[in-house]
Structures are given as C-alpha cells and as structure tokens.
Amino acid sequence: MEKSGGIREESSEKTFSDFNLDPRLQRAIHKCEFEKPTSVQSETIPLALEGKDLVAQARTGSGKTAAYLIPILELLLKQKQIDENQRGIFALLLVPTRELAQQVYNVLEKLTAFCSKHIRFINVATNSSDTVQRPLLLDLPDIVIATPSRCVVHVASGVLPLDKLKFLVIDEADLMLSFGYNEDMKTLSRSLPRGTQSFLMSATLSKNIASLQKLVCRNPFILAVKDKEASGKLTQYVVKCSEQDKFLLAYILLKLRLIKGKILIFVNEINRCYRLKLFLEQFGLKSLVLNSELPVNSRLHILEQYNKGLYQIIIATDESGMMGEIEELENNVDFVEEEVISTDQPTLDKMKDQENADVNDESILAAAKDKSKKKKRVKQDKEYGVARGLDFENVACVLNFDMPSNTKSYIHRIGRTARAGKPGTAMSFVVPKSEVGKHKPTSLESCKKDESVLRRLEKKQISLQPYSFDKNQIDAFRYRMEDALRAVTTVAVSAARAAELKQELLISEKLKSYFAENPDELLSLTHDTVSSVRLGHTQRHLRHVPEYLLPKGMQAVNKDIGFVPFKKNNRRKVFKSRKNPKHRHDPLRSMKRKS
C-alpha cells in the first residue's frame, strides 16, 4: 500500500488553471465561483488525473465532491475527443443517502454547464419506480449516481452494465457499511472490471475504510488532508445542563437572538423533534422538521429552500448515528475517527486497539440493553441522512440539542457549519449523569452517554470551550419555559407528528405532479406552518419578552413611547354599548309578558 507524505497543507499558490483542465470545465468552475482549489482538491486532482486510486480523508465542507468530479469529467472529456461515439456507463458514484445523491447531482449539473451535450448523467437514488429508471439506464448515460442498494437492483436486472466502467467513487465511505450496505458492496465489488480507478472519500478514518479499501482499491494513495484556515474558523462550545434546562437555553438562545444567522438543531428521536418544534412555536419561533418519516421530495425541497435563506431554523433527527452505534456494538469494535493523521502517529490498527481500550464499559452495557429498542425505532427510510455529507449552505450554528452517541457522528454534525472557509459555531448540550432521568417528560435514554462521549472528544484533543450563562438572568425566564413545556404533552406531540406527516405526503404528491407543470408556484409552498394541533395551555403573552427580563445590554435605549393624546376615543365605547345593550341586563325588561 502506498501512502502519501502525512499532513497536506493548502497551497495558496495553486489555481485550477495549473491542472490544465478542459476550457469548458474551467469555464464551469469559474461560473461556480471557485476561486482556488481547496486542500483536498489540490492534492486529489493531480493524482486522480494520473490514474491513481485514492483514499482521501478531509473535514466536511472541504470540497471533496468537486475533488473527484473534476478529474472524472476531465478524463471523460479527453476520452470523448478520441472517440465521440463510444457509449457506456463509465463512472459510478455511490453515496449512502438520497439527499447526498441529489446534492452530487446538483454539483454535476453546474460542472457540466458547458459540456452537457457530451456528458450525460442520471440519479437513480430517487424514489421513482424501476419502470421509469429502466429506459434511462438502457440509454447508457456516462455517469450514474446511486445508493448501493439501488445499484445492486439494477445490476442484477441487467440494465446497469459495468463492463465498461472506468471510475468508481464511494462518497462518505466511512458510512457505507454502518448504513447496512455490507452485502451490497461485496456484491458490487464482484461485478467491477479490472483496472477500475477507485475514489474513497471520507471525513473520518475507520475500520470500514480499511475493509472497503480491500474490496475496491489497488495500491491506493492515502491522503489525510488538513486545512488549517478552514478548521480554525470553527468555534466549539459545550454547555452542561439538566434535561429540562436544554429547553430553557434553546428558548433564550433563539428568542433573544444570541445566535445570529441560520441554525441547524440536531436531536436523537423523531418525537423529540416535534416536541421541540411545538415548544418553540409557543414563543413565535417557526422551525422546519427533517426526519426519515417525511417523503424524500419534501426533504429535498425543505433543504433547497433552507439553502435559499427562506427559513432560519431546522430541527433534524440524526438516527443514522444511532444505527452506527448499534453496528459498533454488534461487531465488538469501536470506530476510529481522526481529523488529522500524521506520519509520526501509530498505525491504523494500533489506533483501533487504543480506541477499544478507551471505551466506557458502562456505556456499552447500557447501549446493549437498548439495542432491540433502537432497532425497532429505526424503521424509517434507510437511505435518509442529514448529518452526513449534505451541504447546508451558510449555517451559522450547529446546536447539538441532544449529544450524538459517538464521536464520529459528532464530527459529521459540526461539519455542517464553517464550510468553505466561512466561520461557524457548534454548541452541544451535555447532561451530567447526576441529572439524567430527573424530569421524565424531557428525559432521553441517550443522555446517559453524554459524558462518556464528551470525554472521548477531549481525548482526541478537540477544542471544546465552556459556554457560560448568568444563572440569575436565566432563572428569570424559567417560569415562561415551564408554562410552554407543560402544554407540550405526549398526546400533542403524537398528533403533531401525524398531522405533519399527512400534510407532507400531500405536498409530496403535488411536488411530483402539479408543481412540475407550475414551477413558479413552487415558491409559495411552505413547510414551516404553525402546527394545527391545539395546545390547551398556550398563552399569547409568551411570544413577547418583557423588557424587565432582558439583559441590560439588550434593553431599549430610547424609552420614548411617542405622543399619547389626552382625548379618548369613544368609538370603542359606542360599539360596546350597541353590542351589549343595557336592557338585556335589566331584569324587568328581559321578562316576557304572558298572554
């Protein structure tokens, strides 16, 4: 196995013109406003153009998608110049989720803006039927984007021939096996022709990478890339609080706008998602919900409109992190995640042994007890994932309302912010063991592992700063939080979940039919409508924050309320008198005379 020379830093001198790319491809790159190649692009593109197999590890948001698409398109365009009439499926791009497949498709559309007549591609990871996809595949597009499960189905049916395949990409490779694609990947590896150039792209290195590498790669270059400039702009905070105080802090952070910009909130359960949504609604804070129950068309449309800036808050469930934990327990191994791997560190196998030794025995036992319960819970769309690989644009803050169950999931979550050199903030709520289970309505089983996950993050030298609040000022808001939380009952959460699912199913059908014919009206479609579920204890005054509760720095400087006339408006009085005439309250006049 060939290995590159340790950490690769970004070279500010390199430009895309240094790669001698096709002019059409360079124009598309310029149109995408890519000023210069990122670290992973600077290292990957030259090696890929030489025909090398690559295993590239870089932080999320570092441009890994373009890092493999650009060299593949360049080599395909050169091939087309030699023989323009050659037909076949030359590139297969495998991704773990449907959302990521659509994202790759969108990037591919932009990069082929000036060569779309010569490069044809298709995304078969959608929820369209096989009868629709079959003729499109029989037309032999140059590039196919798919999840492993969809790919295996089409290969078995004979409509996806791989005999002419030249490029294989496994994006988010560290997640492929944890998503349950073990057998699918083994089946596909037996169908690959010899000499296929393989790309394994990942945000972390794990045992899964080593097993996939043996299946599809031949003497790959292993690139562990760190972009100091990008990673330095991510600020990570941790807040230790009780389960109930999570809701209090979320209310304060969002209502007082202590976090400015778009926010992505992660929770660990679908019911938790709707509980938080209903809670925030009572304070006039609208939010979107993303989970595996929603139709894929609705999920993609929500993501698209969030990226356009139409919405500010998304509450997403990260059930894939729970699935990854189950597989770790069943295989009796623990994932190894490293943001940077240098040449003077131990080998991959030694690091795995060290990581296994660090696992908290108590957390393993607790997770094993809940294994069957978790398996029942993960019955939704297997190919759903929002924490992994998706490009949420301009996210100012990632809020881990519920701490992820492993460090690998944490790295993927916080990677949704501070992308492409922009600053970002990640904040995590950690529940101490002494506080777990004290407030049953807001209690969550996964909170038992919060402290063990935090210790493992600290061992990996991930910089987590404490975020301090003034306790006296926080307690002043507590009664408002308790009033709102008391109204969000289990029955209300279940009703909201059912109502939203029904609404989104209807919207999904409209997206497929009506809005296909009326694209202009698509903008009027909203996903953040206030829940129709009536909460018995909802109080209007919660939407307004009294000035006496605000910190001194946030109180209004100008307290002049303007001109108040001395003369009263008597119209209201006249209206009341007409509406409730005095004779109705006069017992003598209200009596009816008997004939």
UniProtKB/Swiss-Prot annotation:
Domain note: The Q motif is unique to and characteristic of the DEAD box family of RNA helicases and controls ATP binding and hydrolysis.
EC number(s) from the headed UniProt entry: 3.6.4.13
Helicase C-terminal domain residues: 233-485
Catalytic reaction list: ATP + H2O = ADP + phosphate + H(+)
UniProt gene name: dbp9
Location within or outside the cell: Nucleus, Nucleolus
Motif Q motif mapped to chain: 14-42
Enzyme class, spelled out: hydrolase
Name the UniProt record assigns to this protein: ATP-dependent RNA helicase dbp9
InterPro entries: DEAD/DEAH_box_helicase_dom, DEAD_box_RNA_helicase, Helicase_ATP-bd, Helicase_C-like, P-loop_NTPase, RNA_helicase_DEAD_Q_motif
Organism: Schizosaccharomyces pombe (strain 972 / ATCC 24843)
Gene3D superfamilies: P-loop containing nucleotide triphosphate hydrolases (3.40.50.300)
Top-rank taxon, per record: Eukaryota
One annotated GO molecular function: ATP hydrolysis activity
